[in-house]
């Protein structure tokens, strides 16, 4: 794309969300119904976000049952961090990435937790494919690799099937790696840190199954633990040697929230601000209560009948999601994901216990009323700052990034003025927030834009804007 990042241009295949473009194109051909492409992509994130609720239901249903799945879909549909990243007009990476990710997670857990032969084989293959599509749509989907890898490291200590895990884990991993090679941007993951940890964890699963097969049963845990220690030391050694490059700063920051202050450019972006306690409560509110209930039940041995592998996977993905979200305000979307999984399972267990008990019927009705009240509170209160009021905010281009629910044509008119009053070969210097608008609506070349491809070029632009011309 020679109209962005002048004079270098942008290699779309190398650093763009190609799966988003391909998916939008396919959906447009199937469901465009003679509408313009512009109108279609405005509606696209809204439709995909709605469909994601179905994949959330399917995923959580495998972990906690049908009631938990339905509650998860409900919580997903009213979660402010999620629907604010998928509003009408938000043709960005998160909605489609989450859709593919939850679909992949459903196929993964249903494939690896139930030995159904060829059906598990097919599910695990498609799980790898859809997760790679999610990664191509949004880099943040790398998060979903974390619980899978941790689960791999715990899997040999949980599963007793001698011949199932030894092929199930490699099938998913190979499918994922081969699918990542479909796109230039994601293919770099296979030879980088992501491919390394997936490869090491898969080797660990296979070798542990072989160890259990050829060693005394009394020494299974001991031998697997020794091998796990050696795998971790080997991974640390590879990273320390520099053979494999470390993740980018944003990904390192997600693992260590305190790194934010080390990079002024990252810290200057409003959505990259470190999450505060008050901000977290605004975003997830009563979901925190539901999540705590879920953690309590999942750690309890006597009160629930969920299989140990399901409980552990739910705890892994829930707790890691909450931890990752502490890095950036933008990543509160993962706090919501974690609390939705934990909270829906916790509420499903609580509902079952209360409604099946011998408690006086009015008490059961009161309990349902309290839960309903907790659900409704952040949705309708406070009046001007409720979650539903967030959905009424127009796209940024219509309100200039202000905190007021206004809608003006100032920016569209400005883009139209640029298009009609500058030459076609004009190069527009602006802050990166406006690069996409100028390129797409004004059809003019820009120096920086929202892709933040070249950090030093953004810094030079910032210096130019804040200094006095000589």
PLM regions and their residue ranges:
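Perimembrane helix-loop-helix junctions
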Residues: 116, 144-224, 349-353
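Extracytoplasmic
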Residues: 51-54, 355-470
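Membrane-interface coil-to-helix junctions
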Residues: 1-51, 79, 92-93, 99
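Membrane-embedded helix bundles of polyisoprenyl
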Residues: 43-62, 67-115, 119-157, 168-184, ...
